[in-house]
Amino acid sequence: MSGNQPQPSVAIAGGGLAGLAAACALADSGFRVTVFERRPYLGGRASSYEHPGTGEVVDNCQHVLFRVCTNLIEFYRRIGVEDQIRWYEDMTFIEPGGRSTVMRASALPAPLHTAPSFLRFPFLSMKDKVAISRAIGALTLFPPSDVRHDAGKSFLQWCCEHHQTQTAIDRFWKPILVSALSEDLDRISISSAAQVVRESMKSPAARHMGVPAIPLTELYNRAGDYIRARGGEIRLRTSLESFCSKPFCAQPSQVKVHLTDKEDKTAKEESFDYLILALPFNTLVRVLPQTSESESLRQHLTHFESCPITGIHLWFDREISGLDHAVLLDRTVQWMFHKSRLLITRSGRGQQEESGERTAGANVARDENSAERKLREGHDFSRAVEVNLKNGASAPHASYIELVVSASKNLIDKSRADIVDLALKEVREFFPAAREAVLLKSAVIKEVHATYSPRPGLEAHRLPQTTPWTRVFLAGDWTATGWPATMEGAVRSGYLAAEALTRAAGKKDSHFLSPDLSATGLMRLFS
């Protein structure tokens, strides 16, 4: 765009990863971007806030990434927070009773790099390992048509047809796929499961896990700073209620957006050259115009369902484990993240090294829909955020851990007390040191609409970034990104929306997507 032309204006509804990725890419390309976010902070479902009652800054749920997430890593590099991710090459599996096993890569070429560790897994029999190895080969090396495409069959059905033992399902496939896709195996499509397996096997680096070392909202506030530094604007506590644009026109008028300022409860109307709807599917359906052009979109959106994830935050009076994270087998809780070891304090060391000092969250705002507001209004908040204070602030050398339960439908209607009791019972099974530890305080966060359910047949209903309105585009991890509902999928959707928008604006050569992680070793023969 020439310097003599005014910058085209873009409204982006949604300040989650999809909206922020699109905004950063467009701000770098000469567009004047305004991001509208209904909450008082950025990050969407990947956010944090000061918990009312514990006084601690907590993430709404633990988020991790892997080296295969090339667009998410590029996004972090773009906004200057790549150094706030801690990377791990090894993964520890723990059985009830406390026996642990480490999976690590060997010098063998992909996909054999983890074979030595896998063959030494004591919690799988040789029969289990043979069955799993054959299934991995079918999913990654010579996938049949029902694996390459969504054949309307669940992964659990596929496992039964491919002679997977019950132990292989419970102790291998469930820990990997339920955590990755936030859904039960009988509701996961084969193609979604196969993609997770293929991506993890393509190189030794693919399975390296990254964990944010600062609160999530602090991480994504950097994206807000990045956008503002390039002439953009972030408007928090402002929600898009509806929009108006002429469909299928070569030269349509600007897009009119109808907004509500949640601070002063005022409604307003503004016009922009373009609009990106970076909203969850269940929110998008409410803002679509009541016109015939919306009908096809609405029909597709009816096929989506939400999957919940529950995070259980526990503060103990002593260190219960020397591990930073671990996969937990055979119980309700699937992962443990040792936050007092993971989080970086202002001096740059982990909390454990700082004698229990609380991690600061300089720009972490309170959620307007948090338990605190609901308490003031007298509402029951048992489905959102629940608190149990047992004592005062965390003691020096204490442990703060977060436990994660993906696909946690069976926990949604349980009380905080029941969930904390369950978590304590299981933690003490896995970590003997926890049996003598005193629980200081706890919090339970239920993210009811954490992801979409990757059910068989759903791929056909994931929408592209373009819409019937030539100046309106879609972003979100639920759109047709080629990836499941992950942070990587969200960023990809934002970049795809930005590419579609720049093409509509006449910039045909704009590309924002990063290349996929290259296959190495023998996997190069099958990529």
Predicted regions, residues:
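Extreme N-terminal leader/targeting segments of oxidoreductases
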Residues: 1-10, 28-29, 520-527
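Mobile amphipathic helical/loop "lid" adjacent to a hydrophobic cofactor/ligand pocket
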Residues: 72-73, 77-78, 82-193, 201-206
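N-terminal Rossmann-like FAD-binding beta1-loop-alpha1 element of flavoenzymes
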Residues: 8-35
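Glycine-rich FAD pyrophosphate-binding loop
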Residues: 27-52
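Mid-domain catalytic core of redox enzymes
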Residues: 238-246, 253-346, 365, 384-385, ...
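Conserved flavin/dinucleotide-binding core of flavoenzymes
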Residues: 336-346, 396-527
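Glycine-rich active-site loop/strand segments that organize a redox cofactor
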Residues: 44-67, 139-143
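Helical element adjacent to the flavin cofactor pocket in flavoenzyme catalytic cores
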Residues: 196-244, 252-261, 274
